[in-house]
Amino acid sequence: MSQTITIDPVTRLEGHGKITLKTNGEGEVTEAYFSVTQVRGFEKFCEGRPYYEMPGLMARICGICPVSHLIASAKACEAIMSIEIPPAAAKLRRALNLAQTIQSHALSFFYLASPDLLLGMDADPAERNIFGVAKANPKLGLAGIGLRRFGQHMIELLGRKRIHPGWVVPGGVTEPLDPAKRDEILRMIPEAFANVRLALEWYKQVVDRFRDEADHFANFPGAFLGMVGEDGGLEFTDGKLRLIDAQGNVLLDKLQAAQFDEHFGEAVEPFSYMKFPYYKPLGYPDGAYRVGPLARLNIASHAGTPLADIELREFKQLANGPVLGSFYYHHARLIDILHGIEVIERIFG
């Protein structure tokens, strides 16, 4: 007999969602849906607002990654005004964005993913959380807490508060860097390096236990989209867009943000409030693509920092071409963190 299984709400994720599974008479899953159940409405309630309010409003899209939305909105305002921000402001924005990336990735890897990797996917849900991780492997738990604290404290130092900082504005940032704050950030960096390297070593030791999941879970051909620098390297803040296919062929390169709508569209499905972006020439759903850490490492030719370059070369050996398994988002996040710490040290050092 066919059956519908609903998991509502889904826990251990950033946001609100549910999963619906439909099975046939043999108990095999025939359909699976992930539904975003929260109405946001940002596009609508921003209509008619003064442009200079946009960064502050857009930051409220998320309490975990507000800096990305803050900077993207400020850059849109600057494009409207045809202004270029000072180089020092660009560097400070990059540092702030990398701090957010570090704390957000630490949340995802250590708080949301590592309980499954350390304790097992069938472990008691009451124990399968960051507290269970800290109990079973105190060093790993403290490393995760330390990396998240590093990123959050750096955001607070630069932006005056950890969530929704108002430091980034159209035209740059509201104030220059205080040397005392710079020195405090530099003092935190050695511990941050030690924590991410501990996590990378641990992940590489345990990943073989999940080889079946790594090889089969959400492992499918598809496109990858992200930003790269002028030299094709890893970039988070000021790059241009590159799109590759499942074989690694470049479909689009050096695409400006203003050209996005020419090449990409958004589909709507009845089961979710989330929109579904796609590459127009391939249509929907064939033109769907992945973004984020896995996409960034797949599209980038190099990281541009010594330690992350070593890790990226090793990562690219996982497949003959782009790494397609979504399980490897975990690995990619740790490399992103390592790269971010290196760039922050370079900016402030």
Regions found by a protein language model. Name each.
Residues 1-349:
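Active-site bordering "gate/hinge" segments
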